[in-house]
């Protein structure tokens, strides 16, 4: 067990916050497969302060989702401090996470996300302001650095700890790398040796063996699975088994995986409405089609889906093909 502030994490694997991915239905799937901590999609602190209804909706969580974190992004200490309690209230989360790692251009241009790694003094003031504003533990997610010539993860981690963060998550790539190349697990190991708060290792966990290896190699307290979970929430079960030195469970049959994908979208429709859920299904459902015969044909149908009935028809057609 790992403690993040006063919150107990009963397992080694956590789900990364990912925009457009980690909504409540997907988090529920990952939790059912052994994710010990889940996190909302990142939301704009400024949008929360402006009481944007769509932003509030992104934070919606079922009452039984614990332990859980809510993630906000922004660079203005006063705005972040005002938004932090709101994020916890709307989500019911136990932990408040600050995004200082997002590499996306529109986020960077506003001075948010990993742009804060270029201004550690401001980043520290943001963390201090948020820590003072909430009773919950505050965590920070960041990267190796801005680029190859500006690798400052160790010093940044120490700053986070000094500013009051209860834990940190480190992605082993720079902002300039985005998601290209290999994640540098050495920098995560260096960070772990430099701080006393829990360290969460993130980057290139695509198998159960990867999950076990990153924890052994870096000495990190927890491992955070991101893109590896796309269409594969069962990765958490395999990772937990590998870490425990047990045989990894087999993937469920393709028919069951496709059914899980459909249930995910149906759950999303209950929360967001059918139209938005179907728009998101155009990418999310396709992740589950790996290994399906004629997958490209089905993908061409899915990317035009507008109703749940259409998606159900495609799902049943896939299942018929798999049984034949």
Task: Enumerate the predicted regions with their spans.
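N-terminal small/glycine-rich loop or linker at the start of catalytic domains
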Residues: 2-14, 46-67, 102-112, 127, ...
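Active-site beta-loop-alpha junctions enriched in small/polar residues
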Residues: 18-20, 43-45, 73-75, 101-103, ...
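Alpha/beta catalytic cores of nucleotide-metabolism and tRNA/nucleoside-modifying enzymes
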Residues: 1, 9, 13, 19, ...
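Alpha/beta enzyme core
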Residues: 81-112, 120-197, 213
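Hydrophobic faces of well-ordered beta-strands that scaffold small-molecule active sites
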Residues: 13-17, 38-40, 68-72, 96, ...
């Amino acid at each position: 067990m790992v403690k993040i502030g006063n919150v107990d994490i009963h397992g080694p694997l956590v789900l990364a916050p990912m925009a457009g991915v980690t909504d409540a239905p997907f988090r529920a799937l990952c939790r059912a497969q052994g994710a010990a901590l889940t996190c909302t999609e990142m939301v704009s602190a400024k949008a929360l302060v402006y009481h944007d209804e769509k932003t509030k909706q992104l934070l919606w969580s079922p009452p039984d989702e614990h332990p859980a974190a809510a993630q906000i992004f922004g660079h203005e200490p006063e705005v972040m401090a005002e938004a932090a309690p709101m994020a916890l209230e709307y989500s019911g989360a136990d932990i408040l996470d600050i995004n200082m790692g997002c590499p996306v251009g529109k986020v960077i241009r506003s001075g948010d996300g990993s742009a804060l790694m270029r201004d550690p003094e401001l980043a520290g003031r943001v963390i201090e302001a948020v820590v003072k504003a909430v009773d919950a533990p505050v965590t920070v997610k960041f990267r190796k650095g801005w680029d190859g010539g500006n690798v400052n993860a160790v010093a940044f981690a120490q700053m986070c700890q000094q500013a009051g963060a209860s834990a940190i998550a480190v992605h082993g790539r720079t902002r300039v790398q985005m998601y290209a190349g290999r994640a540098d697990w050495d920098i995560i190991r260096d960070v772990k040796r430099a701080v006393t708060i829990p360290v969460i290792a993130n980057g290139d966990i695509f198998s159960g063996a990867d999950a076990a290896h990153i924890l052994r190699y870096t000495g990190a307290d927890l491992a955070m699975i991101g893109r590896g979970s796309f269409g594969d929430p069962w990765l958490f079960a395999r990772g937990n088994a590998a870490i425990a030195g047990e045989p990894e469970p087999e993937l469920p049959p393709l028919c069951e995986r496709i059914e899980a994908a459909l249930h995910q979208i149906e759950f999303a429709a209950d929360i967001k409405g059918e139209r938005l859920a179907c728009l998101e299904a155009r990418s999310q459902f396709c992740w589950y089609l790996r290994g399906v015969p004629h997958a490209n044909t089905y993908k061409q149908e899915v990317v035009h889906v507008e109703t749940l009935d259409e998606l159900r028809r495609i799902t049943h057609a896939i299942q018929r093909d798999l049984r034949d």
